[in-house]
């Protein structure tokens, strides 16, 4: 009887014990963008959905996040579909093929925005010659795309009068506001809070992508597509503006436990409204949208969830 009571007590103690702690790092985005607040919302819902999960959120950027997860510096990250595909293929700016990063979910479109001071008289990418530019640090998705756009238009950073590389959108806005830069490039949602802040201080305009540049980009990487920033998105924007687009998605280390990623994926699908409250573009996203194949291998946990709900 004593042995039986001891076994029962041990079983009850085990059942009551808290889940084993699981510490993970989640790389998000630069200050002033949408990834930091969205990361905070995901952190809350994931920690609630997975007992024992503790998430440390750190700033990041699309390409840096993919490399961080691949190199074991983080287990979760936001990324951009176009440049994640570059990593899987081992194309520049990645030094080697990315092999330890798996797809969790597509979330919403990103808009590559070329924002110019109205006084700079920049109507096309070709007009960037001789102008001063601020973009993100080397290796950031928007910075890489800035370089590609310049190249496709017969230009380079050397063709500009000055180039600033700033990690925080807020710092870039300050440079533009003070007149130390004439053009600001960034990849984020539309409207972007950083651009709204800038537009409240200076008259600005969006530079449209031309068909030749768009066609060349899409031929090199199918992850790019043309999006439209509708008239009225920003102050004094009277016309629709075509821009280069790609998707924001969540990636995870392929060796992150299957059950953990399954619960995280389910939590996202069950809380679209909570995410859309932070990033309006997520509104109406369905599991089939989250499960769209972008050329990045699915994590087994995410794949399990999508198959269960008929999205794969």
Predicted regions located by residue number:
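Pocket-lining segment of extracytoplasmic ligand-binding domains
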Residues: 81-83, 90-93, 120, 156-251, ...
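Bacterial N-terminal signal peptides that target proteins for export
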Residues: 1-8
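Extracytoplasmic
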Residues: 33, 50-52, 61-64, 71, ...
């Amino acid at each position: 009887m004593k042995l039986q009571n001891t076994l029962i007590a041990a079983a009850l103690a085990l059942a009551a014990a808290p889940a084993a702690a699981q510490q993970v790092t989640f790389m998000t985005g630069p200050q002033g963008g949408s990834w930091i607040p969205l990361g905070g919302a995901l952190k809350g819902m994931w920690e609630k959905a997975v007992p024992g999960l503790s998430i440390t959120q750190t700033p990041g950027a699309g390409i840096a996040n993919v490399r961080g997860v691949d190199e074991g510096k983080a287990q979760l990250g936001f990324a951009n579909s176009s440049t994640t595909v570059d990593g899987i293929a081992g194309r520049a700016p990645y030094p080697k093929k990315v092999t330890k990063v798996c797809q969790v979910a597509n979330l919403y479109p990103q808009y590559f925005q070329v924002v110019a001071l109205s006084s700079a008289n920049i109507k096309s990418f070709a007009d960037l010659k001789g102008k001063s530019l601020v973009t993100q640090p080397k290796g950031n998705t928007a910075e890489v795309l800035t370089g590609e756009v310049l190249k496709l238009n017969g230009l380079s950073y050397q063709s500009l009068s000055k180039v600033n590389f700033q990690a925080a959108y807020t710092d870039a806005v300050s440079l533009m506001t003070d007149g130390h830069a004439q053009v600001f490039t960034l990849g984020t949602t539309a409207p972007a809070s950083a651009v709204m802040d800038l537009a409240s201080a200076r008259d600005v305009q969006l530079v449209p992508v031309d068909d030749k540049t768009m066609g060349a980009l899409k031929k090199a990487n199918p992850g790019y597509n043309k999006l439209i920033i509708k008239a009225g998105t920003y102050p004094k924007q009277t016309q629709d503006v075509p821009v280069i687009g790609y998707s924001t998605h969540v990636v995870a280390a392929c060796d992150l436990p299957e059950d953990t990623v399954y619960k995280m994926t389910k939590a996202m699908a069950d809380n679209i409204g909570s995410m859309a409250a932070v990033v309006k573009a997520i509104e109406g996203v369905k599991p089939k949208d989250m499960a769209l194949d972008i050329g990045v291998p699915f994590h087994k946990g995410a794949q399990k969830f999508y198959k269960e709900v008929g999205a794969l």
